[in-house]
């Protein structure tokens, strides 16, 4: 890593929202971040094409959220629900943008969630996702994993704050995307007296040691320190455990 990477500026932030409480929390955090960075906030609501296709199946059923009753999954009712959710998201984004005095836009797309997110991420500097949503934790876990590994911009996985100081976990493997994620994390944590943890992804101890030295030297040049963990195999469950131990946000 070199000093030029530290000059990267976040001017456009994409936040994907599905009207769940945790995604609204991510929206609020994104608005705060956009205000502090004088960045534009882009809200994205995705109508899941797989869910809509399932609703067209004669065998599709849904369980009432409160009553627990089982009924046919009606595609027309589902589309009305999706439109209603999108309106709620847009209204909340408008309120937050007005309160935070930030530029914003909102878009509704229909398609596969991973593909739509990756497409929207192609022209932004940071992507923010809530930790849960889009039909539950399992769906978000695979979505976040796909976006984080393939998106050209760093992806921040947000959860509601549990401490007074921000905590960010960076997954670092030395790649260009990982370097951008470390740069973004450093920019977010500077001046906030927060906590930074770096999960080193490596094939062996020698590579892990080299990557830790590389990251530590770069962070020290910005008067930052971090806590390090070495991982030699990574799956979704390991990342989830790290998130629960290390901090509220993961890059």
What is each stretch, according to the model?
Residues 97-105, 220-227:
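A short helix-to-beta-strand connector/capping loop
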Residues 104-107, 133-136, 174, 228-232:
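Short, flexible loop segments at the rims of nucleotide/cofactor-binding pockets, characterized by
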Residues 108-115, 231-237:
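Charged docking surfaces used in two-component/phosphorelay signaling
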Residues 78-85, 89, 109:
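Active-site beta->alpha loop and helix N-cap motifs at the rims of alpha/beta catalytic domains
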């Amino acid at each position: 890593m070199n000093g030029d990477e530290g000059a990267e500026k976040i001017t456009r932030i994409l936040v994907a929202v599905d009207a769940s409480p945790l995604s609204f929390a991510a929206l609020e955090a994104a608005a705060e971040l956009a205000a502090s960075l004088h960045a534009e906030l882009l809200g994205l609501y995705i109508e899941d094409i797989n869910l809509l296709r399932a609703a067209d199946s004669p065998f599709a059923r849904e369980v009432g959220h409160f009553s627990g009753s089982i009924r046919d999954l009606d595609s027309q009712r589902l589309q009305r629900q999706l439109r209603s959710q999108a309106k709620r998201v847009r209204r909340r984004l408008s309120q937050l943008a007005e309160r935070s005095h930030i530029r914003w836009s909102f878009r509704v797309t229909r398609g596969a969630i991973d593909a739509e997110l990756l497409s929207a991420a192609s022209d932004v500097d940071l992507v923010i996702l809530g930790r849960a949503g889009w039909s539950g934790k399992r769906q978000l876990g695979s979505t976040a994993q796909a976006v984080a590994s393939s998106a050209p911009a760093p992806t921040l996985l947000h959860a509601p704050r549990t401490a007074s100081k921000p905590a960010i976990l960076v997954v670092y493997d030395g790649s260009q995307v990982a370097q951008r994620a470390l740069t973004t994390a450093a920019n977010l944590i500077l001046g906030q007296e927060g906590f930074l943890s770096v999960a080193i992804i490596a094939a062996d101890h020698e590579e892990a040691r080299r990557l830790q030295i590389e990251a530590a030297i770069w962070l020290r040049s910005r008067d930052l320190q971090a806590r390090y963990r070495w991982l030699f195999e990574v799956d979704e469950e390991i990342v989830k455990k790290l998130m629960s131990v290390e901090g509220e946000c993961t890059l």
